[in-house]
Amino acid sequence: MVPGVRLMPADVLEKLAPEYPIVADILEYRQLTKLKSTYADGLSGYIASDGKIHTTLNQTITATGRLSSTEPNLQNIPIRIELGKLIRKVFLPEDGDLFVDSDYSQIELRVLAALSGDERMIEAFKNGQDIHRSTASLVFDTPFDEVTDLQRRNAKAVNFGIVYGISAFGLSNDLGISRKEAQGYIDSYFVKYPKIKEFLDQTVLDAKKNGYTKTMFGRIRPIPELNSSNFMQRQFGERVAMNSPIQGTAADIIKIAMIRVHDRLLDEGLKSRLILQVHDELLIETKEAEKDKVIKLLEKEMRGAVDMKVSMEVGTECGYDWYDAH
């Protein structure tokens, strides 16, 4: 960064891009520079003498209970842009092996449905419905088969926003709509999913009373911000209280799944091994001859990690590099 020169944030540039074509070039240049410095150049410094990169998974750094990855952070390989995704092609298994990658589908929304006991959302998951299309149908009062792609995208933002205690202001910024319209989406959501509203409100009340929240498995997260004299800090504390039982329970489930998968691989005498966890995703390096058995084992143990009102769904891909397996 040049002294005395202000750096314009990316979100500001994105708003200017439609009016000034050069802005798109600036954003692309920043993106490419980031990919080169952080990943193309940055990862090469972590290659060990055995030709591999060995990350460190930390158990007690994040407040939510999620594992974090450091030196290097392999949980932060880009996924939103195709060029960033291609970085995964440099991660290869041993010769003759392949990767099996299994990912929980919408785990936090499934946890929300189970914790809240909201019958409508539980039923949607049990029926195998597209939960974002189902929510769009309810929130926008549109027949399920007539929901537009835009309505589904907006409903997806509301679904995930609710998990993080999003405000009308935050949702309006995310969707580029008025604050009044965003509040209407949120209000309609809670009318259609009343048990979710009750659950979130009760969770905040309990957190204020106790000073902490709990996951489904009883793991505690203190929230001192709820007692702050600063209004903004208290608001932040309320959002944390809403989200922590959901994200924390999801973190507990994936850790239980990791233990189950690891133990089963050993019990079955397989040479395949669990090599990485990326939030809701487990990556296994497997022998070609063990592939089918490993896929069945992996999906069974991930689904069986928790018994609740909403079943866990798992998607699995295989490939000869991490990109193809993701």
For the regions a protein language model found, what residue spans apply to each?
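Short acidic (Asp/Glu) and glycine-rich catalytic loops that position anionic groups and cofactors
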Residues: 1-10, 68, 87-95, 110-117, ...
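Conserved "right-hand" nucleotidyltransferase catalytic core of DNA-directed polymerases
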Residues: 1-82, 92, 98, 108, ...
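Conserved catalytic core of nucleic-acid polymerases
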Residues: 18, 54-55, 59-62, 137-270, ...
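Function-dense linear segments that define catalytic or interfacial modules
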Residues: 59-144
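A structural signal for short secondary-structure junctions
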Residues: 92-95, 267-270, 275-279, 306-309
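A common structural junction motif
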Residues: 192-194, 300-308
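Short beta-strand->loop micro-motif that forms the acidic, two-metal-ion catalytic signature
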Residues: 281-286
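Conserved short beta-strand edge segments in small beta-sheet-based binding/regulatory domains
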Residues: 305-317
